[in-house]
Amino acid sequence: TDATADYYTAIKMGDVDLSLTAGGTSFELDGTLSIDTFDRNGVASPTGATPGERLDWSTAFDFDSDGTADTFDPGAELPTPQDLTIDFTDSLQYRLSGSVTGDGNDLDGNPGTVFLNAGDVSFAGSAEFALSRWTVDATHSSGVLTDTTLDSYAFSLNDVTLEVDSVATFSVTGAVGFAKVTPTDATADYYTAIKMGDVD
């Protein structure tokens, strides 16, 4: 009822066919995306101020007032019901899966077919993907980093160029997982990890 309070939005898509052209600010991917699934947990302020935490949709509602959280499934109201249960925790920002064909620049700024630039790592070509972004606390040797951004990527690759700056450039076919942790302090170190499975 407070017109100045934050408001909360959620989107859930399952088994959809959606195409869009992405820039580097769209899920950190550059190129043409074909989306199969998409979940988003949003919070915004009507006053333009910095919003607070996102909603934990898995515990937010008690429709029958019995003291137990109830699930919220807008898809249950469709003429042909679909399971679109919105049960996102407040740590989720978004997650999606599909395929991408890159058209971005490489690490040196040269035009190419890069679909992901993340720190000192880039991927070029086309791939199937699953990615997500979360707000989490991360523990490292010096303590706990609070409210970091965790970006998670998984790719199914076919002859994709993987470049690790100042290390090597690879041509990769197979499965690759990549993660990046970014602290709230823009001057602090960020952390990356790559795992390859069944690659050529």
Regions found by a protein language model. Name each.
Residues 1-200:
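N-terminal low-complexity, acidic/Ser/Thr/Gly/Pro-rich segments
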